[in-house]
Amino acid sequence: DNRYKQNYYAVNVYTDYSHSFGKHNGKVLLGLNYERYNQDNMWASGTDLTTEDKPFLSQTQSNKKNGDGYWNRATAGYDGKYLAEFNIRYDGSSRFLADKRWAWFPSVSLGWNIAREEFFEKLSETVNTLKLRGSWGQLGNTSSNYNSFWDWYPFYQQQAISSASSNWLINGEKQNTSSLPSIVNATMTWETVETWDFGFDFGAFNNRLTGTFDWYSRTTKDMIGPAPILGSVLGTNAPKTNNCDMRTSGWELEIGWRDQINDFKYGVRFNLSDNRSKILTYPYDGEFSNQSIGGYYNGKYLNEIWGYESVGLASSKVEMD
């Protein structure tokens, strides 16, 4: 039997209020989002049935993910020169157990449009926009490395049952067996992605020439990393844990030009970026027999290639000795 079904539902609702007085302006937004995901995937066949009196399949599972979020955003500005924004989110995910399911995530950003200042008037006809900005914020991440709830929480529903699969005989016949799932980590919770960002936007020649530049440092705290390898005497795998911190630093540059010749409009855009990810902390550094180039090592960049340094080649037996 082979069956597959997938459903995804998403609802976003928000309301806002704006008010201006003099050179001041402000805006407040309130919103919520609601997501439901359900996947049913089954392939099954049966041989050596323990009994034919119950012709049905057991231990079937579905993969469900639910997420709810509530957010608030407040913005304020003065004369198009000074800008501020504050955000707060309260997110919940069914990927975590009940007491670890919800968390708060704030962020704040500031901007300064220098092109609106009086001391910039001499250049304002050429440079229409020159905005400096900076921001700090946190977002929650549920980790994209493990898609199934059962990958995270292998409860008894995943206990495997096999017919006539034992390695020993009783009365000349192999016996039915069951195997325990992995250990459950009841403390697993959100990964917190904390980002610092500094950059500027510019526009010149009536905004025909535009560009942005950003430098950022993004730290993923309590990242769900590889579990340690435990002795085979345990009989199962170690549970996944929030055991790793990683920092990604990089920059992004974008420059564009758009113009019109008679009725012909055209535009070009150039993008350039670079970033590197570095493992800050990982408690099982160097303890895995299966660590490879893609493994986690404290203080090393992700996917960095490194190894032993050569001290030279021996050209005689004396040097070998």
What are these regions (language model features)?
Residues 1-309:
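Extracellular/periplasmic, surface-exposed regions of secreted and cell-surface proteins
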Residues 316-321:
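Short, intrinsically disordered, charge-balanced linker/junction segments flanking boundaries
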